[in-house]
């Protein structure tokens, strides 16, 4: 194992540690427990969107796995069934855990896990972006801390916007924009964003076209 690889691994572990500390400081940490649903239901005496997201997941998990459309939530809604996408229940997580529904407790929730993973990735991508401009690990940590504590992020937690907490998807798009064009990575990120929230898909699409324009400009005007 090369020294550079060890150094990079230690840096990433440091970011994960920082993200975990801020996750615990911000949420208390207990939301990651799969059987903890109390935080989703009125613990703040405020009606948020979390209740809707969880209830939609309960209906979806009890529908057939092989159905068409895949994310159709036939039992959810009044008379006219809806789609899991419309209830902001993070489709990529829902379809993953639906495959194991027979092994999950009734009060199972994946939203806490999603938030924790989002904290880690929210800290990682700013670090990777800033590393393209400076070799300072301290500056990278400060940059990650800024994005982890940004009010625009923590605001989503307060109002129960779990899917929109995945703002790291936008940062990942910026990271791809700053690197060499790779169509496969853009397709993967676009697909992922669509399985999290349509808003992210729209933003990633704009970044993708910006990348195409930038790449085309470098071909037409190679000396710019």
Predicted regions and their residues:
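Short, Lys/Arg-rich, polar N-terminal cytosolic tail immediately upstream
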Residues: 1-6
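Residue-level signature of transmembrane alpha-helical entry/exit and packing/kink sites
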Residues: 8-15, 112, 140, 182, ...
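Hydrophobic alpha-helical membrane-interfacial segments at the cytosolic entry of transmembrane helices
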Residues: 10-19, 215-224
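Membrane-interface coil-to-helix junctions
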Residues: 22-122, 150-152, 161-166
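Transmembrane helix-loop junctions and nearby membrane-interface residues
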Residues: 27, 102, 212, 216-219
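Membrane-embedded helix bundles of polyisoprenyl
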Residues: 116-129, 138-178, 183-215
């Amino acid at each position: 194992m090369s020294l550079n690889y060890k150094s990079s691994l230690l840096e990433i572990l440091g970011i994960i540690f920082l993200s975990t500390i801020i996750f615990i400081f911000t949420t208390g940490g207990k939301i990651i427990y799969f059987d903890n649903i109390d935080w989703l239901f009125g613990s703040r005496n405020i009606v948020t969107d979390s209740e809707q997201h969880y209830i939609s997941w309960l209906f979806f998990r009890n529908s057939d796995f092989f159905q068409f459309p895949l994310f159709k939530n036939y039992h959810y809604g009044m008379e006219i069934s809806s789609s899991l996408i419309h209830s902001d229940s993070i489709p990529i997580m829902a379809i993953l855990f639906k495959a194991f529904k027979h092994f999950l407790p009734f009060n199972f929730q994946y939203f806490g896990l999603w938030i924790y993973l989002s904290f880690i990735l929210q800290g990682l991508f700013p670090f990777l972006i800033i590393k393209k401009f400076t070799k300072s690990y301290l500056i990278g940590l400060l940059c990650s801390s800024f994005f982890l504590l940004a009010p625009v992020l923590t605001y989503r937690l307060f109002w129960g916007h779990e899917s929109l907490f995945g703002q790291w998807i936008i940062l990942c798009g910026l990271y791809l924009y700053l690197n060499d064009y790779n169509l496969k990575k853009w397709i993967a990120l676009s697909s992922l964003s669509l399985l999290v929230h349509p808003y992210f898909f729209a933003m990633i699409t704009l970044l993708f076209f910006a990348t195409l324009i930038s790449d085309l400009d470098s071909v037409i005007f190679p000396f710019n």
